[in-house]
């Protein structure tokens, strides 16, 4: 299922009083909570993340201005992330890359745990 937006607006929710809103001018999608499916029944080949600090050390967090909207943001550069964790980067039909930031969470959790063990 997909949702096509031809302009700004809101998608009302039958469950909560907080709708999903989309601003076509800024490319901003807002919701109270974004969930990512994480149920074990939907996964296969589950393995532990090892050497997470080494992986995270190869990444660079950056601040930047979004050229299309002129707004300040922070994150990673998809092309740089792709050299380290290519499965967290997608490329659309125009060649524009996007990042699965939720996918970084497991690496960050394990890196923090590794750092804690090494204190």
List the model feature ranges, each with a label.
Residues 6-12, 113-119:
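Short helix-capping/linker segments at secondary-structure and domain boundaries
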Residues 29-101, 111, 115-118:
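C-terminal intramolecular chaperone/autoprocessing and neck/assembly modules of extracellular spikes
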